Structures are given as structure tokens and as C-alpha cells.
Amino acid sequence: MTSIAISSGSFDPITLGHLDIIKRGAKVFDEVYVVVLNNSAKKPFFSVEERLELIREATKEIPNVKVDSHSGLLVEYAKMRNANAILRGLRAVSDFEYEMQITSMNRKLDENIETFFIMTNNQYSFLSSSIVKEVARYGGNVSGLVPSCVERALKDKFQTPLK
């Protein structure tokens, strides 16, 4: 049986922290779908299409990763892909309460889909897409925080020189 996992998020933009979780998940599962979810509570900086392209570029060296988007419930997407797992990254204890609520709801919707938590490497424990955008907005150096394709895309969006 093929093991299929879903790694979802807004990825606005994808960071090296996200990429770390994806790479580590890809070592455990036969296939990993990286899915951009449309979060109605967030106003996106990059369009869904831009995010998909950035993720494809960032994950092109990982052969068992596929990139997609979805606007419905994650559990429904997982069922559609015959996935048996959801991958979630945890940066700090503060992430756990929110993630536990989401996991409990997903389990209520489908008890056959397990959630696997992966602790972020310490070097990325502070990192979020919001922080990256804020630093880039003011022309700060985001290399070492995001893949190079994202660094270029941020520079283009903000019209700032790379530092």
C-alpha cells in the first residue's frame, strides 16, 4: 500500500521551515502532496498561482512531492487523493494548542486519516511567512529564510534590491 501524506498551508510564501518539514515528510511517505489552502481569514500577498509556482520551484529536487491547491476541507482533499496522513510542522509549544484543535476536528470528520506532527529544526523555530514578508518589505535580508526563488519574488513584489 502506498503511503500518501498531505502537507497543507497558505505558504504565503513558502519558507525554509516549510521546506524542511516537506523534505523530512518525503523521507517517510511514498508521496507528499503540498497543498495550498485558500484561507478565507487571510488576505494573500501572493496569488494561489504564484504560490504554486514558488512551491514547485522550491521542491523540484524532491521526486515524490506533488503540488496542488484546494479551497475546501483538507480532509476532503485527503480522501480525494487516498491520503492516509496529514503532516503538520510545530515551531513551538504555542503552535500545539491550535494544531490540536484542527487535528481533533479532522479526526471527527474522518477517523482514518492520521495527523503526524514534525518538530521544526531549531534554526527555523522563529520563522513564519508573516515575519519574512515584514523583513522583505523593509529591504531586509531574507536569504537563509526562504528558497532563492521566493527571495527573488519578494524583491520583485516590493521593488527592493537584494541585500
Swiss-Prot record:
Substrate binds at S10, K42, L74, R88. InterPro entries: Cyt_trans-like (IPR004821), PPAT (IPR001980), Rossmann-like_a/b/a_fold (IPR014729). Pathway: Cofactor biosynthesis; coenzyme A biosynthesis; CoA from (R)-pantothenate: step 4/5. It is found in: Cytoplasm. The keyword Membrane does not apply. Its cofactor is Mg(2+). CDD domains: PPAT (cd02163). ATP binds at S10, F11, H18, G89, L90, R91, E99, Y124, S125, F126, L127, S128, S129, S130. It catalyses: (R)-4'-phosphopantetheine + ATP + H(+) = 3'-dephospho-CoA + diphosphate. It is an enzyme of class 2 (transferase). One of its GO terms (biological process) is coenzyme A biosynthetic process. The record marks H18 as: Transition state stabilizer. Pfam families: CTP_transf_like. GO terms for molecular function: ATP binding; pantetheine-phosphate adenylyltransferase activity. It comes from the Bacteria. Keywords: ATP-binding, Coenzyme A biosynthesis, Cytoplasm, Magnesium, Nucleotide-binding, Nucleotidyltransferase, Transferase. Homohexamer. Reversibly transfers an adenylyl group from ATP to 4'-phosphopantetheine, yielding dephospho-CoA (dPCoA) and pyrophosphate. This is Phosphopantetheine adenylyltransferase. It comes from Bacillus cytotoxicus (strain DSM 22905 / CIP 110041 / 391-98 / NVH 391-98).
